[in-house]
Amino acid sequence: MTGALLALCLLIVATSPLAWDTDRMSLSAQIRGPKAVAGLKALLPVLTASAATDELARLQNINEFFNRRIVFRDDIEVWGQADYWASPLEMLDKGEGDCEDFAIGKYFSLLLSGVPVQKLRLVYVRAQLGGPEGPSQAHMVLAYYAQPGAEPLILDNLITEVRPASRRPDLSPVFSFNGEGLWQGTGSQNSGDPVARLSRWRDVLAKARAEGFQP
């Protein structure tokens, strides 16, 4: 993609009511290379269009964007590490990611589209594969709460449809967190500062801020 096209895309976003640090996003993408630039170019119109819709439509649009654009790969294949949490631009640059990367990309994108942080939580779960008798594995999803205490809607790289938690009996929450708190399961009892207790979350927050994805 040419620099002129990216500049036009960023100009459209910068003049929207939910403008963010487009200069930093553009520079960060250009430093990473053409794949990151192309990924940002594809994402920005989705964010801009989603910001003009209701929150349910934002969930659906952004969930579908990442599920269609990003190929699932384990961290060891993508990064040569057993567990690596990628920033949004890192994932867009690779075009690949695991469940944490999908959830993190959706989290920051929904924040940029205007969804309040209080409505979003990244949730570590045990996912039952292949039915009740199948094996379980560690997994991460993004949960959206329309109101405090409401049943959350689940955004998952395994299923493109956004479903209420009651329709995901295969998921057993372990703990959840966002930029403001850490909770056991999906409960309301705050268990502390997630930045202090989750070193990978601290790292990805810093990277997202450097890229312009985090205020």
What are these regions (language model features)?
Residues 3-13:
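Bacterial N-terminal signal peptides
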Residues 15-215:
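A structural boundary/capping signal
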